[in-house]
Amino acid sequence: MSIPIESIKQGLALLPERFTNKAVFRLLVAIGLQESRFTHRYQVVQGKPGAKGPARGFWQFELGSEASRGGVWGVVLHKASRGHLENVCKTLGVPFDARTIWQSLETNDKLATAVARLLLLTDPFEIPKQQGAAW
């Protein structure tokens, strides 16, 4: 396992500076370790080697749906994240389409980092300032 520190920094650099600090970085690392150990870029299906579950990227995002407003769709639709995600997609040359974004998370770590950070913007709770609370 190797934490992709540079990719995380580069992904966060695509967002406004106010969205990045040590607490954000620490929480993204904690979530990535929990979800994929920064080893799996798609959801592993137990007992089915090579089969892909519905989640993509180190932070294991599902596509969700417009109706559920969950997963990638939630970040696409939420007023706190939508404009920032549009900018990130434009910068990275990724079409601003929930399915395309979701598919790209498996291979584009900068995009995956930005989407993971933007999801945190949609949460009403503050990012933990103390290291222990991030775990």
Model-found features: residue ranges?
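Short, solvent-exposed secondary-structure capping/transition elements
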Residues: F125-G132
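Helix-loop segments that flank and shape redox-cofactor active sites
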Residues: L14-K22
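Alpha-helical scaffolds flanking conserved acidic
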Residues: K22-A30, G132-W135
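Peptidoglycan-targeting cell-wall enzymes and recognition modules
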Residues: S2-S7, G11, L33-F125
